[in-house]
Amino acid sequence: FIDKVSTDIYELDRGQICKYEGKFDYYLEKKAERQQQESVSLAKAKNLYKKELEWIRRMPQARGTKSRARIEAFNELKETITAPTPTKSAELTVKAQRIGGKILEINNINKSFGEKQIINDFSHIYKKGDKIGIIGKNGCGKTTFLDIITETIKPDSGKVTLGQTIKIGYYTQNPPAEKSDTKVIDIVKKISEHIQLADGTAMGASQYLTHFGIPPYKQHTHYGNLSGGEKRLLNLLCILISNPNFLILDEPTNDLDIYTQMKLETFLEQYQGCLMVVSHDRHFLDRIVSQLFVFRPEGKIKEFPGNYTD
């Protein structure tokens, strides 16, 4: 969307506005270069600060003009190294449970609402590593399809068979209700206080929430004080840390800011389980899926190898 309607990108970053002349990919490239330059400059400033700090400690009192100027420069240097820095885009992939030989089989399912055919005789056998995007017009039956897969509703005919080792994590557009006076961090800790990552390490619940855009002060507020978008983000993160090996996501990027969405994209790119996602975001689908289910009129679902651009 940004590429089609804009020629320049302005970013508000740590109280400053940075201009990037070009498309979104150009912005990402130049932003990474700028952050790299900032990291080098910050490292040099920290080394100089250590040397100047030793001088400050040795100087009992600044009497001369040169000494006072050096102290002023030291104070400016201190402000530089203590200023906010850009958040590092760490790559955090939750450890998925083991997947057995049988994952999910859909056999000749049909679903109608009244005279409207939503799904017409669809079959599919899922394989390890499948990452499938689901696209179609609003109201064509995409969410109904996910509800059938997760056994939230039943098909009119046909069968869905889930493998014994499969644990589904289902993200819907309507998060489950939590008590309004429950703290955000307690909701997460109820699932797990330490999140097991794919590389064998673990991360505290608070640190994981911070990475995905829920800062510490928000973690200790009550659930009832969150906005609708914040509640959906919290629900998504709770699903991710429950270690599912089959993720089913219905419009997961709605209400996410661009940086949280980029972190989610990185997470899903590295995700080792199976994935099925409904989204209208073409860029998002291009990054994470390798196959599409395209909903056609009269309940027909066409399988297409490739991403949205393909």
What are these model-predicted stretches?
Residues E52-Q61, N75-E76, A90-A96, K102-E105:
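Alpha-helical coupling/stalk and coiled-coil linker elements that connect catalytic or binding modules
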Residues F1-L42, L92-D310:
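ABC ATP-binding cassette signature C-motif
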Residues T82-S89, G158:
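Active-site phosphate-binding and catalytic loops of NTP-dependent enzymes
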Residues K30-R63, S67-I71, L77-I81:
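Intracellular alpha-helical coupling/juxtamembrane segments of multi-pass membrane proteins
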Residues P60-R63, K78-I81, T85, I195, ...:
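A general structural signal marking secondary-structure boundaries and capping sites
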